From Swiss-Prot:
UniProt-listed HAMAP family: MatK
Keywords carried by this UniProt record: Chloroplast, mRNA processing, Plastid, RNA-binding, tRNA processing
Domain of life: Eukaryota
Listed PANTHER family: MATURASE K
Listed name of the protein: Maturase K
Family: Belongs to the intron maturase 2 family. MatK subfamily.
Pfam family, one: MatK_N
Disulfide bond residue pairs: none
Gene from which this protein is expressed: matK
GO CC entries: chloroplast
Amino acid sequence: MKEYQVYLERARSRQQDFLYPLIFREYIYGLAYSHNWNRSIFVENGGYDNKYSLLNVKRLITRMYQQNHLIISANDSNKNPFLGYNKNFYSKIISEGFAIVVEIPLFLQLSSSLEEAEIIKSYKNVRSIHSIFPFLEDKFTYLNYVSDIRIPYPIHLEILVQILRYWVKDAPFFHLLRLFLYHFCNWNRFITTKKSISTFSKSNPRLFLFLYNFYVCEYESIFLFLRNKSSHLRFKSFSVFLERIFFYAKREHLVEVFSKDFSYPLPFFKDPNIHYVRYQGKCILASKNVPFLMNKWKHYFIHLWQCFFDVWSQPRTININQLSEHSFQLLGYFSNVRLNRSVVRSQMLQNTFLIEIVSKKLDIIVPIIPLIRSLAKAKFCNVLGHPISKPVWADSSDFDIMERFLRICRNLSHYYNGSSKKKSLYRIKYILRLSCIKTLACKHKSTTRAFLKRSGSEELLEEFFTEEEEILSLIFPRDSFTLRRFYRNRIWYLDILFRNDLVNDE
């Protein structure tokens, strides 16, 4: 990020802190290219086309200003008749430029806030997305009720842009951003359908995620205020790093809205045991108290989205369940609280008592059905989980084919090693292992049985030991009790920064 600071200081000295001129800087697109090229992907490493011209980008922006009276809908051809260039390709280039430009000043504000709060070191320790599970194991065993909430999408992208305007004050920049969304994202509708937003998020992932994260950050800031008003306790693990422009005016308006809808003031409902966890567009709300207070929080969320962000949300989409009877899905895991009952005989003098002890344990397991569905979509097996060959990889060498399957198998094993039950993980390994053998047999135009007999199945299957198993097998014998016990225990890795591509929370 030192490159960001150098480029931003240079641009500030020349352009007096405006973001709009940065759109026409070539190093901005170089940073965007470097970000996409170096980002690690779990399943397959995809390239990024670097055959772009800054001159063509400038011409396209100029043409957008000159032809702003024309409506270029999503049904138009990929070739713009006025330019002769691929419209979809250059729209992605410009969206990358927008995303990288607005990220620069906000990242510097975030870094300075983190340094002032002196939490840089602790922040680096919890960068892994798996660091959330030790928190769940520590807190959720004492809770009784849970609500699985899907954060609704805005009905129009203009809502996301307006939220961004509270942070960045640059009228030309936002004029160009709106013009871009109008021309290339079919923004000439009063209501943007979910399909249109999904299409935009896939074609412009970085820009959409940036706008969406602003929307989530805004709603969570207000939620933090409500939570502090409803509890004597304060968040110690959460900080508002950036200044909230117009936040106090919004807060007063929000209190007025809630005071009209509820007959009791917010401080009346004290809930010190509320816990909130979110990843991307899904959040988990859990509490120890009665469902009445959880139901109040449910209505707070609905009124917040509908009255403050103009986002429609139905009350029936948010369910409140007992944690011991309901599993919630987060980051590709199914989690629930299991009750372990044990009977202890206690004797006092000549009287004997039987005492039933109930202990709670958080079970975190691999969702086998969604994972098999993802493997079937990637053509590793059918919908029933039966392994099949992958003919599209048959043109590669034997080493490359095995290396691809090994990479996927190791990444899945690395990601799901925190599971309480490893049986489902072993089944996934078996599917990938047999799919690899079938692919190699298909390449050599042989049956699976004949290929295994000719190549030696033991040596081939030995390659599918994960890196952790290989290291541990050098320390402990493969048939030792210590090694088998270590395999059964949960292991959380703090180096996982991205969710696996085969993981699906839907």
